[in-house]
């Protein structure tokens, strides 16, 4: 997989860095678990633009990755798109402090520093484009002052092959060690990377 360097969003659209290579080459997604999930999604495409929800077999996803996996239902209410958790791995609900299954995203994520709007914008963009996406952001809340980094893949699923009705997502949360210079000092939210994953690029 290669990378389309098109980016969008409402929160600090200037990326911290651009990653030059693709998933199949091992260069874009900076976490092996998320890369494995992307490879699985591509295999399940079977030559189509995106897999169906029924094509995703939990047994086929390695056990080490499953705690990082979420499945979200895309709910269309007229022109509005909402996202409801249908499955959330333990890593996610432990980070959020509650099990979110069955709840809408706005009932779970904090609105602090525009974080809820940021995540909704990522899922909305990916849903409308019908293309897999990788993103990274730094976030602090409640005056903590020490940022958490989130690495995220958002992968579209569609029962009719055209309209995205489900999202297969993977999240990895990283917490800095004391004086870890890899984590910038930020106040609130900062996006580092947002790129489409080009699944048609050669290996």
Residues of each region from the PLM?
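Intrinsically disordered, low-complexity terminal regulatory regions
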Residues: 1-108, 120-203
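Helix-loop-helix
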Residues: 113-116
